[in-house]
């Protein structure tokens, strides 16, 4: 029993030490110009970005962050248009995914079609990925030029500009803080992901 307790105490101490070590300029950066009105937790990515693919498919960073967030905390993902020949079209397609609520259905297929099989070479190819993932073609077409999708595209572009986004993947909290992966412990993938998620939670609680 004593051994179990000591092990548990060690875990608590390790967690406390980890939380205490989160600091401005290391695991996160306070923005010089905070941006009001941004989603609580905002992640920027591109289907063309190899590191974004790693974050999503290998490290599962987004999933781990979501698990740590307090109940009711909204996490939003925006696509950027400044990477790749179909950056604009993929940003619009991501807006379609948000409008139809099919982000989880199309994320992995789009990453794989853009980076792995390289079968996305046109707007029609993007549409095919959606259809193959179970989205009705008519629903996709109706959403593509809709007011809602146009607004979501503008929203993504404005957020990237307002936050002076330099590259992806990138995550911001409350429009005030940017996560700094370069300051994370990279001794193992699990430790890195855990610290990343802990840092986001710390900043959400900090407000």
UniProtKB/Swiss-Prot annotation:
The keyword DNA-binding does not apply. Keywords: Disulfide bond, Periplasm, Redox-active center, Signal. GO terms for molecular function: protein disulfide isomerase activity; protein-disulfide reductase activity. InterPro entries: DSBA-like_thioredoxin_dom, DsbA/DsbL, Thiol_disulfide_DsbA, Thioredoxin-like_sf, Thioredoxin_CS, Thioredoxin_domain. It is found in: Periplasm. Residues 1-19 form the signal peptide. GO terms for biological process: cellular response to antibiotic. One of its GO terms (cellular component) is outer membrane-bounded periplasmic space. Disulfide bonds join 49-52. Pfam families: DSBA (PF01323). Residues 20-158 form the Thioredoxin domain. Required for disulfide bond formation in some periplasmic proteins such as PhoA or OmpA. Acts by transferring its disulfide bond to other proteins and is reduced in the process. DsbA is reoxidized by DsbB. It is required for pilus biogenesis. Belongs to the thioredoxin family. DsbA subfamily. This is Thiol:disulfide interchange protein DsbA. It comes from Salmonella typhimurium (strain LT2 / SGSC1412 / ATCC 700720).
């Amino acid at each position: 029993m004593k051994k179990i307790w000591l092990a548990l105490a060690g875990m608590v101490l390790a967690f406390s030490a980890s939380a205490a070590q989160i600091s401005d300029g290391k695991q996160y950066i306070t923005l010089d110009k905070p941006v009001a009105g941004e989603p609580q937790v905002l992640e920027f990515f591109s289907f063309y970005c190899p590191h974004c693919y790693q974050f999503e498919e290998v490290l599962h960073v987004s999933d781990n962050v979501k698990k740590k967030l307090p109940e009711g905390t909204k996490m939003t993902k925006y696509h950027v248009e400044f990477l790749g020949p179909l950056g604009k079209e993929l940003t619009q397609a991501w807006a379609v995914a948000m409008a139809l609520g099919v982000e989880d259905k199309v994320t992995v297929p789009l990453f794989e079609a853009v980076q792995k099989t390289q079968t996305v070479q046109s707007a029609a190819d993007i549409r095919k990925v959606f259809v193959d993932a179970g989205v009705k073609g008519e629903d996709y077409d109706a959403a593509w030029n809709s007011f809602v999708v146009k607004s979501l595209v503008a929203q993504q572009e404005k957020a990237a500009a307002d936050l002076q986004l330099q590259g992806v993947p990138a995550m911001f909290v409350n429009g005030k803080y940017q996560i700094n992966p370069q300051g994370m412990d990279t001794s193992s993938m699990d430790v890195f992901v855990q610290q990343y998620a802990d840092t986001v939670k710390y900043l959400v609680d900090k407000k």
